[in-house]
Amino acid sequence: MDASLLLSVALAVVLIPLSLALLNRLRLGRLPPGPRPWPVLGNLRQIKPIRCRCFQEWAERYGPVISVWFGSGLTVVVSTSELAKEVLKENDQQLADRPRNRSTQRFSRNGQDLIWADYGPHYIKVRKLCNLELFTPKRLEALRPIREDEVTAMVESVYRAATAPGNEGKPMVVRNHLSMVAFNNITRLAFGKRFMNANGDIDEQGREFKTIVNNGIKIGASLSVAEFIWYLRWLCPLNEELYKTHNERRDRLTMKIIEEHAKSLKESGAKQHFVDALFTLKQQYDLSEDTVIGLLWDMITAGMDTTVISVEWAMAELVRNPRVQKKLQEELDRVVGRDRVMLETDFQNLPYLQAVVKESLRLHPPTPLMLPHKASTNVKIGGYDIPKGANVMVNVWAVARDPKVWSNPLEYRPERFLEENIDIKGSDFRVLPFGAGRRVCPGAQLGINLVASMIGHLLHHFEWSLPEGTRPEDVNMMESPGLVTFMGTPLQAVAKPRLEKEELYNRVPVEM
């Protein structure tokens, strides 16, 4: 590269951001306050790894609605229930679009799925499909045996680990047992296939499935800082071949499974799995192949890690709070007894279990900043100007810990949800683990049912305690960085069987 070209690049790097900053001051109006951005990088160097905590700290300093600059892109973050209502209800339609970076643009085939689609005819059509066909009470009930099967498989796995010779009283990594049920459940619901046998061995398609998921995560995490600075992207071009290969591999596996189901439809008729529903409804809803594949993988990415995260955080709170654990076990013994396993039909008679689920999701929402919204027009939030094209995030982690709304917000106390009937599926803006408005998670009830079932079974079958010598305050309750927030340190706990009948610890397999 000769000297004149180097000089041109250097001048561009300096002058373009200064010019843009001047133009922004003139056209953007009265923006929310926030930390002073650096030239070119914006606030990227100031953002701490665990963003929900970082943004809460900034909200305490600058106010409940703040401006955060990701390079040259503006993101507005709100941190109170009142402002969440402004974003997700009062300005819902104007803020219903999704920002797509170069990676999500390619993964979603320019928003042909649901999660990354802009609000418009395509989104409305696919959302209608989800609400009227895929996540109906009738379909969720029809698929209940799969969920109950996989939860009993989890119980069997924990029991084997806890009672193996030499393991009595030894801690186990709880997440390992949760991941198995989440993987099997979502693949069976979506594809109608169990890729794992009774011994925990994964077949060839299952290994390919896991490889595709892991590759997608690696590719998405490999984006450079140029992703946030549009005028530098020519210096950091995407590896288009990498995305092309990944998508082709994903599509090839998905289409093979769809073809298998098409064959089974002819032989035995339609079932209730999501792939069967999409195949049956493809013509009625005018679904492209890209949309069918995108919807199936939306369900997988949205439902796998979030379930594990939610249950692991709940178990961490329960081993740190023996009073709550004992109270829940007393309710389970009273309603379910000690001679059978819990069923989802028991939920209506288990209010404390429901309160435990709600309190766990209040303190530890698996997606603490939700997915970003994008302004399709100029709007006002909290009296500030939000320009068209800006991203807007709701810090639901901070909203649910607001001391102005919640008494003793950091205390784990499920009783608060017995004292007041608080909805967690989007109608009460004080607690929003599934979002609200046009972008609320369509599978919220499915997620709640699975989390409640897993927690209920783990507490009904076992007493849980911390490893010897570990105090409640010793458990690391910090989150890991990322869009979804696992526990930074995987929970280790000791499981002691509490039901007398050994057969209650066996998996109850269901073929469907």
Swiss-Prot record:
Q: Which InterPro entries match?
A: Cyt_P450, Cyt_P450_CS, Cyt_P450_E_grp-I, Cyt_P450_sf
Q: Per UniProt, where does heme bind?
A: C441
Question: What is the topology of this protein in the membrane according to its UniProt annotation?
Answer: Single-pass membrane protein
Q: Which residues cross the membrane?
A: 3-23
Named from the GO MF annotations, one term is:
heme binding
The record's listing under Pfam families reads:
p450
Q: Which Enzyme Commission number(s) are on file for it? A: 1.14.-.-
The question of whether Transmembrane helix is a record keyword is answered with yes
Its main localization is: membrane
Q: Which PROSITE patterns match?
A: CYTOCHROME_P450 (PS00086)
Q: Which GO terms describe its cellular component?
A: membrane
Q: Which cofactor does it need?
A: heme
> Could you tell me where this protein is found in the cell?
Membrane
| Entry keyword Lipoprotein | no
Which keywords does this Swiss-Prot/TrEMBL entry list?
Heme, Iron, Membrane, Metal-binding, Monooxygenase, Oxidoreductase, Transmembrane, Transmembrane helix
Family assignment? Belongs to the cytochrome P450 family.
Protein name (Swiss-Prot/TrEMBL)? Cytochrome P450 98A1
What organism is recorded for this protein?
Sorghum bicolor
Q: Which gene encodes it?
A: CYP98A1
